């Protein structure tokens, strides 16, 4: 009776694992996992909606896994894998990118499957050693651009994409079904809420999380992204399977066009992001005046962010979306507001461009905050400054209000002229 119960239990576990796996094709299965417990990505980017670690297995004459998962999620991953392949052996694990959220399964796979080979490029095998994952020479297959890995029916080839977003990053392309396993490219924050494919999901949420992922993780690397987009432009793609987020099996051109815009730091649509730092409320009042006037002028997409509350990752996502940017700050020991300073530093590091910028702020005796924003703007030649910086001393007077209204009008004029 106990033996029968154990058999039933094992059968139930396999049935649940199979239910949580999803077929992309009859012989290609998603065996990824959702992580809803993780609080911050790389210890600094909040994950309010969690994240998914996508992994895929191809069932052919040879069995091949494409990318693993975070080590802490190996339990769910291996249950899905075993339920999918049964008692067959895994022949290959392709590592498109060696960060721990993709390479966390390698050590366990090497122990479980005695003949498995780790497939990666020379740099990936080298960097794995730095991450304490030492692959024996007889268990490593080093591939180069457009090498072929023959699984039987499926023939896989490889596209190196250095600095998208690590030097060893690459994509795997299934020449049989025209599927691109793109790793972090085309990825997104956010766990999957039932829907696996883009045509099944509410894209409003995922597009925001995809932009937040891109702008913060890949946003600095426009040139390498453009290079890989050019490289892939002649490749027929029926489906994009990234390592995080939704699988794109419809509207492939839509997601590629988004990447082209993001890589060139081109705004997606008309709108203004107003970001401010205020200690006593005066700069807050200035932001509200600007927003109200922009609305009066017919600018519908206006978003105000208090930098003391909004995480910088959300600020970046909004900045990447809209054409207009207005930054306001009080003065804090001759510097900008403490939460505005790191924003300026990161924007400069990422090379923000193709935006209209308005500058405003407040001071009482020494000033310096607005000057810091102006100096930042002057260094970024790809920004077009709108009007002159407005620095108010103390409370906002009627004259100050008129200056702010004029600044908002200048921003609105620019946006309307672009329609």
Question: What is each PLM-predicted segment?
Answer:
Residues 66-68, 90-98, 118-121, 180-183, ...:
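Active-site neighborhood of phospho(di)ester-bond hydrolases with catalytic His/Asp-centered motifs
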Residues 165-169, 185-219, 263-268:
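Active-site-proximal loop/helix segment associated with metal-binding centers of metalloenzymes
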Residues 61, 72-119:
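Active-site metal-binding motif and surrounding structural segment of the metallo-beta-lactamase
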Residues 192, 202-240, 244-247, 289-303, ...:
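FMN-binding flavodoxin-like domain, especially the glycine-rich phosphate-binding loop
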Residues 22-26, 120-169, 227-229:
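Metallo-beta-lactamase
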Residues 3-17:
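Short, Lys/Arg-enriched N-terminal segments with co-localized hydrophobic residues
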Residues 21-81, 171-174, 178-182, 283:
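Conserved beta-strand hairpin/beta-sheet module of binuclear metal-dependent hydrolase folds
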């Amino acid at each position: 009776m106990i033996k029968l119960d154990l058999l039933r239990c094992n059968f139930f576990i396999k049935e649940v694992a199979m239910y949580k796996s999803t077929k992309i094709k009859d012989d290609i299965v998603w065996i990824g996992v959702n992580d809803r417990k993780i609080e911050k990505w790389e210890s600094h980017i909040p994950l309010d909606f969690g994240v998914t670690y996508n992994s895929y297995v191809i069932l052919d004459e040879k069995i091949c896994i494409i990318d693993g998962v975070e080590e802490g999620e190996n339990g769910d991953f291996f249950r899905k894998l075993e339920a999918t392949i049964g008692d067959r052996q895994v022949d290959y694990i392709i590592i498109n990118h060696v960060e721990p959220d993709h390479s966390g399964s390698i050590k366990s796979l090497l122990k479980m499957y005695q003949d498995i080979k780790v497939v990666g490029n020379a740099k990936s095998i080298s960097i794995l050693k730095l991450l304490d994952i030492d692959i024996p020479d007889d268990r490593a297959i080093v591939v180069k651009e457009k090498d072929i890995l023959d699984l039987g029916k499926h023939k896989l080839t490889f596209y190196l994409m250095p600095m998208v977003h690590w030097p060893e990053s690459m994509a795997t392309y299934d020449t049989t079904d025209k599927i691109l396993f793109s790793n972090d490219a085309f990825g997104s924050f956010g766990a999957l809420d039932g829907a696996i494919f883009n045509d099944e999901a509410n894209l409003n949420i995922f597009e925001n999380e995809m932009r937040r992922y891109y702008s913060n993780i890949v946003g600095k690397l426009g040139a390498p992204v453009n290079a890989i987009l050019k490289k892939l432009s002649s490749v027929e793609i029926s489906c994009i399977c990234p390592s995080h987020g939704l699988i794109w099996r419809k509207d492939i051109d839509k997601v590629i066009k988004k990447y082209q815009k993001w890589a060139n730091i081109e705004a997606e649509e008309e709108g203004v992001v107003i970001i401010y730092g205020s200690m006593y409320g005066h700069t807050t009042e200035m932001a509200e005046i600007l927003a109200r006037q922009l609305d009066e002028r017919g600018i519908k997409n206006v978003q105000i962010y208090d930098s003391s509350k909004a995480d910088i990752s959300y600020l970046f996502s909004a900045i990447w979306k809209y054409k207009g940017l207005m930054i306001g700050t009080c003065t804090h020991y001759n510097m900008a507001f403490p939460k505005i300073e790191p924003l300026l530093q990161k924007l400069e590091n990422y090379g923000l461009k193709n935006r209209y910028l308005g500058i405003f702020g407040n001071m009482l005796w020494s000033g310096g905050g607005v000057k810091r924003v102006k100096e930042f703007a002057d260094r970024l030649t790809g920004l077009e400054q709108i009007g002159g910086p407005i620095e108010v001393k103390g409370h906002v007077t009627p004259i100050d209000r008129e200056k702010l209204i004029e600044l908002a009008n200048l921003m609105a004029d620019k946006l309307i002229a672009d329609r």
